[in-house]
Structure formats: structure tokens, C-alpha cells
Swiss-Prot record:
Region listing for Interaction with DNA, in residue ranges: 210-212, 310-317
Phosphothreonine, modified sites: T32
Coiled coil: none
Name recorded for this polypeptide: DNA dC->dU-editing enzyme APOBEC-3G
One of the GO BP terms on file: transposable element silencing
Reactions mediated catalytically: a 2'-deoxycytidine in single-stranded DNA + H2O + H(+) = a 2'-deoxyuridine in single-stranded DNA + NH4(+)
Gene (name only): APOBEC3G
The enzyme's E.C. designation: 3.5.4.38
Residues the UniProt record annotates as site (Interaction with DNA): N241
Length: 381
């Protein structure tokens, strides 16, 4: 039976928007799915506008006919598809689509190769369950772009889909932190990998290469089972530091602190032992080293191993910070050839190409290792 569409013409109430699009990663009692859509199209019909935007409301129920995604597909097929040559569809959704809806979206996109779809979701629904993780991967594999809503998209929805009475969008305090956690989690689920050029440029340990102002952190997690460290493949990925932004992320957040947020978010069992290994393009600054040491003291079931490509020495106190980590029982070392290769094989979208070391990689690694040991032994203050 063809689902009856409900196309909400009236803009969303502000309280409805804040309640349903609040991006706290774990939320209950949100049983309504809101789908704000925009369709940019090329058409031979001059009476049709080039941009159509509106809202569908659906339910998180066992009957997928009542899901907002199904309403949209039915509406689009009946109203726009016959007149469209090319269409760019964007969904801003409060929850990501279920496996059934993903299958229907995949069929739709396969039937209409000139239609593209971007799904930007405020939250991830049941992302720890295998079926829902598989649904997200399948959605991405259909060619749809899947992403987490960022500050600009929340503001865009506020401006275009909410009866805001000309009031500006006021983000909740935890929006940036929640966004970062969800973005990294989605990267884990979709098994995102780093671009090869990005890896080589940011992880090179050649001191003559300048301009690496960002910090990348690759991580993997193992837990101790019967005396053996067993990989937790669902917790493996890479993190980029959140740059400071006067609007969306005023304070910024270093990659190490994003990792601590993520470990807390995983809710690892206190009765088990875990080992987190991170390969980072810059060693931690003093402030991050202090916070990492405090975190490990509060979470004795977690061990952290740090291997850095370069020593971050642009701020005072970096030596003290490295020694603080060492005293906290965190092994810290400089990356060697084997670790660069491991990162290339594990975290980089290398398309089957082997790791090609840059000139004097081993020499730079040895020099940096000697410098790190001198710091940890408190030589030269």
C-alpha cells in the first residue's frame, strides 16, 4: 500500500526543533523523526522553482510505511521526478534511516542515477547494534553522502525550517562536543580512512617540512582476554583536532582531548582491562598531557600508549608535560618506520599502494627518540 504523505507546510515550532534535533548522542523518548529536505533541480518546466524545501514528519515504529524517508520518496516520485533531469537532494534528519528505508533509498538511487542524496543527521540511532551499523554502511555504499549535522547546518535549519520569529539561532553549550563524538563514531562505523596525501604531509617527521598546523591522531583499542590483547575493531579510526572558531567551536579542542571524550563515550567496562594505542602527528602539549594523566588516574582500567611523529615544542612547558605523562605510566615514544607503515596499512585509503617512506625517515626518528629520552630523563630542564 502506498503510504499517505504528510507534507508539513507550516514551519516547525522552535521548541519542537530543539527537542527533536538536540544532538546529545544518547537520548530516549524521541519517537518522532523529522526530515527537513531541500531539492535543487534542473527541469524543463519553467513553472517549477529550482529549489523546493519542506518538512516531513514520521514515526520510529515497526511499520516502515510511516517513516519520514518513505513519505519523502513517495512524494518525490509523484511530484518532482517526472519533470526533473537532475536533482540534488539534502535531508536534515533528527535520526538516521533504518535498514528498511536504506534499502528503499538504495533502490531509488539505483533507478535514478542523476539524483544525488546527502543525509545529514543530528544523531545516530542504535548505532551500537550491528543491523543499524550495517544500515549506515549500506547507505554510504549506495553513493549517498552520510554526515553528522554541524553548527552551520543546525543554523541553516533554524533559518529555513523553524518559525523562529526572526530570533537568531542559539546553540546549546554541548553542541560542538556532541558533534565531534558523533562525527568520529560515524567515521568508525563507515570505516573512514585518511587521504594518503594528508597522512604523508601531516605525519612526516622531516623537520624541514613546515606548515603542519593541525594534529591528527590514529587510534586502536584492545581488551585483555585470558592474558591476550584482543582488538576491538569497532573502536578504530582517526581524529582531527577541532580548530577554534568564534561561532561554532569558540575554544577548539585538541585531538587528545577528543580521544578522552570518545573513550568516556564508549563506556568501557570497569572490570576489564583496555589498551588504547594512538599514533599522533604531534606530541601532546602541556595542557593536554595534564588532562590525559588525570583521566588515566581516574580510569585505571584503561592503559594508553602514545607514539608521536614529531615533538610539539611551540609552547612553554611541553617538556614538563611529557614527563608528566611518563610518570603517569603512559609509554610515549617517537614513531619508527614500522609504526608509520602500520598506520599507512591500517588508517589510510592507500588503494593497495605500499607505504613509501620519505628520505631519512629512520634518521629523523632516531634523532627525535634521543631528544625525547633526554627530556624524559630531565636533561637540560
Amino acid at each position: 500500500m502506498k503510504p499517505q504523505t504528510r507534507n508539513t507546510v507550516v514551519r516547525m515550532d522552535p521548541d519542537t526543533f530543539f527537542y527533536n534535533f538536540y544532538n546529545r548522542p544518547i537520548l530516549s523518548h524521541r519517537n518522532t523523526v523529522w526530515l527537513c529536505y531541500e531539492v535543487k533541480m534542473k527541469t524543463n518546466d519553467p513553472s517549477r522553482p529550482p529549489l523546493v524545501a519542506n518538512i516531513f514528519q514520521g514515526q520510529v515504529s515497526f511499520n516502515p510505511e510511516h517513516h519520514a524517508e518513505m513519505y519523502f520518496l513517495s512524494w518525490f516520485r509523484g511530484n518532482l521526478l517526472p519533470a526533473c533531469k537532475r536533482s540534488q537532494i539534502t535531508w536534515f534528519v533528527s535520526w538516521n534511516p533504518c535498514l528498511y528505508c536504506v534499502a528503499k533509498v538504495a533502490e531509488f538511487l539505483a533507478e535514478h542515477p542523476k539524483v544525488t542524496l546527502t543525509v545529514s543527521t543530528a544523531r545516530l540511532y542504535c548505532y551500537r547494534k550491528k543491523d543499524w551499523r550495517r544500515a549506515l554502511r549500506k547507505l554510504s555504499q549506495t553513493g549517498a553522502r552520510v554526515k553528522i549535522m554541524d553548527y552551520e547546518e543546525f543554523q541553516h535549519c533554524w533559518d529555513n525550517f523553524v518559525d523562529n520569529q526572526r530570533e537568531p539561532f542559539e546553540p546549546w553549550n554541548a553542541l560542538p562536543k556532541h558533534y565531534t563524538l558523533l562525527r568520529i563514531t560515524l567515521g568508525e562505523v563507515l570505516r573512514h580512512r585518511m587521504d594518503p596525501v594528508t597522512f604523508t604531509y601531516n605525519f612526516t617527521n622531516d623537520p624541514s617540512v613546515l606548515g603542519q598546523h593541525q594534529s591528527y591522531l590514529c587510534y586502536k583499542v584492545e581488551h585483555l582476554r585470558n592474558g591476550t590483547w584482543v582488538p576491538l575493531h569497532q573502536h578504530r579510526g582517526f581524529i582531527l583536532n577541532e580548530a577554534s572558531n568564534s561561532v561554532s567551536f569558540p575554544e577548539g579542542r585538541h585531538a587528545e582531548l577528543c580521544l578522552l571524550d570518545l573513550i568516556s563515550f564508549w563506556k568501557l567496562k570497569q572490570a576489564q582491562r583496555y589498551r588504547v594505542t594512538c599514533f599522533i602527528s604531534w606530541s601532546p602539549c602541556f595542557s593536554c598531557a595534564e588532562k590525559v594523566a588525570e583521566f588515566l588516574q581516574e580510569n585505571p582500567h584503561v592503559n594508553l600508549h602514545i607514539s608521536a611523529a614529531r615533538i610539539y615544542d611551540y609552547q612553554r612547558g611541553y617538556k614538563k608535560g611529557l614527563r608528566r605523562l611518563d610518570r603517569a605510566g603512559t609509554p610515549i615514544s617517537m614513531m619508527k618506520y614500522s609504526e608509520f607503515k602500520h598506520c599507512w596499512d591500517t588508517f589510510v585509503d592507500h588503494q593497495g599502494h605500499p607505504f613509501q617512506p620519505w628520505e631519512e625517515l629512520n634518521e629523523h626518528s632516531q634523532a627525535l627518540s634521543g631528544r625525547l629520552q633526554a627530556i624524559l630523563q630531565n636533561q637540560g630542564n
